[in-house]
């Protein structure tokens, strides 16, 4: 069984304190695939309740680019997410306002790198208390994007719809994400304002540990365009410590390989 909170989101077993990720592209030379330079990707720090409290992000050169912090109240409800550059300058922030029961009533996002852009979100809930809509809008009141959530009769999230609005507030794109009973994404697709498919659909498969093992994308004619297959090495806890990602396009035979390493430290 997985733990609660962010341990479950990352399919982590055991009381993980740190998760360090490194990545390496593989190059094909002399009849075999060999790793190129390995570089750090990101690091997650969890508190003893299994919630992410700090995140380090690294750029393509392996240099630290962002430092993230997440803060919670005494009951574990999220209150603030901040990302700063290595010098301490603010890059972005998310401020959460909740009611007495911990239900989110408003969220304010500030993008501080480049032009300062502020957006607010006010979610809407059904009678059972489940979030059914989240509308984001700019300071002048124009709409930015809207999320719509649909649930199974048993209560699990079944589908998330994302509508992105153009400058005239017409729908520019619609993204559909479908989930299985375990909360795993099993299908994604993107449609233009006329309802035509412009990305995907892509289907996903998982192993018994909740790790993604395959992603298959169809082209606009319905044929198979590409596949991405994932294989894993596991530690004694059942957590993956190495993931090999193999991407192939069907028509051209183009192939890329990426290895991701995950070093875990436990409480």
Show the residue positions of the predicted features.
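Buried hydrophobic residues that stabilize the cores of well-folded domains
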Residues: 1-267
């Amino acid at each position: 069984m997985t733990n609660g909170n962010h341990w479950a989101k990352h399919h982590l077993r055991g009381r993980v304190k740190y998760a360090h990720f490194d990545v390496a592209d593989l190059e094909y030379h002399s009849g075999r695939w060999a790793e190129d330079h390995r570089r750090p990707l990101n690091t997650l720090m969890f508190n003893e309740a299994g919630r992410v409290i700090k995140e380090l992000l690294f750029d393509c050169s392996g240099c630290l680019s962002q430092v993230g912090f997440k803060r919670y109240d005494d009951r574990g409800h999220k209150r603030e997410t901040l990302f700063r550059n290595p010098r301490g300058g603010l890059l972005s922030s998310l401020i959460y306002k909740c009611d007495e029961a911990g239900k989110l009533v408003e969220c304010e996002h500030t993008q501080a790198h480049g032009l300062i852009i502020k957006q607010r979100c006010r979610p809407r809930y059904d009678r059972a208390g489940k979030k059914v809509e989240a509308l984001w809008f700019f300071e002048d009141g124009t709409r930015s994007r809207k999320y719509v959530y649909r649930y199974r009769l048993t209560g699990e999230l079944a589908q998330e719809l994302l509508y992105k609005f153009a400058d005239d507030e017409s729908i520019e794109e619609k993204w559909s994400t479908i989930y299985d009973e375990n909360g795993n994404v099993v299908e994604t697709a993107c449609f233009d304002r006329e309802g035509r498919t412009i990305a995907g659909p892509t289907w996903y498969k998982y192993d018994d540990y909740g790790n993604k093992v395959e992603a298959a994308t169809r082209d606009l004619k319905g044929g198979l365009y590409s596949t991405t297959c994932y294989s894993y090495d596991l530690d004694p806890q059942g957590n993956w410590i190495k993931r090999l990602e193999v991407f192939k396009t069907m028509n051209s035979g183009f192939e890329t390989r990426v290895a991701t390493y995950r070093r875990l430290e436990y409480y």
